[in-house]
Amino acid sequence: MLISQRPTLSEETVAENRSRFVIEPLEPGFGYTLGNSLRRTLLSSIPGAAVTSIRIDGVLHEFTTVPGVKEDVTDIILNLKGLVVSSDDDEPVTMYLRKQGPGVVTAGDIVPPAGVTVHNPDMHIATLNDKGKLEVELVVERGRGYVPAVQNKASGAEIGRIPVDSIYSPVLKVTYKVEATRVEQRTDFDKLIIDVETKNSISPRDALASAGGTLVELFGLARELNADSEHIEIGPSPAEADHIASFALPIDDLDLTVRSYNCLKREGVHTVGELVARTESDLLDIRNFGQKSIDEVKIKLHQLGLSLKDSPATFDPSEVAGYDAATGTWTSDAGYDLDDNQDYAETEQL
């Protein structure tokens, strides 16, 4: 785009899970091109987690009731579709719900395994009378978009296993509009305004970053076309392929200290790709994430040939105070003892 001013992106927080993003200036017409692409990607292609099947003790199919439970099984399934969960595991995981009446059963009564979080614990599931008892086994998987129950029905599944419609998308609503903006003497450039509302499992900022990353990978196919080349190869170069593979790595593979790892996980950063989309300023805004944690992250990314969004290309790990680049270890005067992070982890759990 022949614009003398580089486009910028700003964010305005509207509500807890809703933000308004402004991208300007864009060439005339590009506001709708970019806005439509981002909206469709946000609504259909952001990965998330959802319940794919359940098994209720004493129940063989969904067209029945559970003794002592006000809601029938169909109502319970409908309620469980509203469960907002996130999972760090790419493989199916199992959660358990066990509740004895009388009382109300909520999502907070579900016991998730490590790496799985229930984000709406107050959600109503069922109501039990004095003799009511509810035991449910829930399978959670990661995916994209919407998958009907019929596709979640596994061949050879155990008797009593009930498949559930899965709504993986963590994005609830996306709207956009394009307004005119001025660049020097021209007033016909585009200003794109995108309003994004998400579930509690992801922030609007992270959702937009994920959508942008998906589009960059797809548009990279067209960038590979070169009319001067004798042979046109569709796909990323070997170096770019390595980077793309690195983006998909979980941050667990960076072998970060407990302090840095816990802070990033709490912020919703699960992959290297989500990490490199952040600036140093973004990371410093995270509670308990200081400059030494920034240095540690930059060093780990440098080992993969990557960097934070605003890190200079000339970054040299040997210039980081307290870090021995030759041995890959921190000295005792590094600002905080990296071996003492277990105390930090225990404090975080209190």
From Swiss-Prot:
Its BP terms in the Gene Ontology are:
DNA-templated transcription
Principal EC category: transferase
Q: Provide the E.C. number(s) assigned to this enzyme.
A: 2.7.7.6
Q: Which organism is it from?
A: Mycolicibacterium smegmatis (strain ATCC 700084 / mc(2)155) (Mycobacterium smegmatis)
Q: What is known of its domains?
A: The N-terminal domain is essential for RNAP assembly and basal transcription, whereas the C-terminal domain is involved in interaction with transcriptional regulators and with upstream promoter elements.
**A family per Pfam:** RNA_pol_A_bac
Q: Give the highest taxon in the source lineage.
A: Bacteria
Q: Output the lineage of the source organism.
A: Bacteria, Bacillati, Actinomycetota, Actinomycetes, Mycobacteriales
Kindly state which reaction or reactions the protein catalyses: RNA(n) + a ribonucleoside 5'-triphosphate = RNA(n+1) + diphosphate
Q: Subunit info?
A: Homodimer. The RNAP catalytic core consists of 2 alpha, 1 beta, 1 beta' and 1 omega subunit. When a sigma factor is associated with the core the holoenzyme is formed, which can initiate transcription.
Q: Which GO terms describe its molecular function?
A: DNA binding; DNA-directed RNA polymerase activity; protein dimerization activity
Q: What is this protein called?
A: DNA-directed RNA polymerase subunit alpha
User: GO cellular-component terms in the record?
Assistant: cytoplasm; DNA-directed RNA polymerase complex
Q: Mind telling me which InterPro entries this protein's record contains?
A: DNA-dir_RNA_pol_insert (IPR011262), DNA-dir_RNA_pol_RpoA/D/Rpb3 (IPR011263), DNA-dir_RpoA (IPR011773), RBP11-like (IPR036603), RNAP_asu_C (IPR011260), RNApol_insert_sf (IPR036643)
Record keywords, A-Z: DNA-directed RNA polymerase, Nucleotidyltransferase, Transcription, Transferase
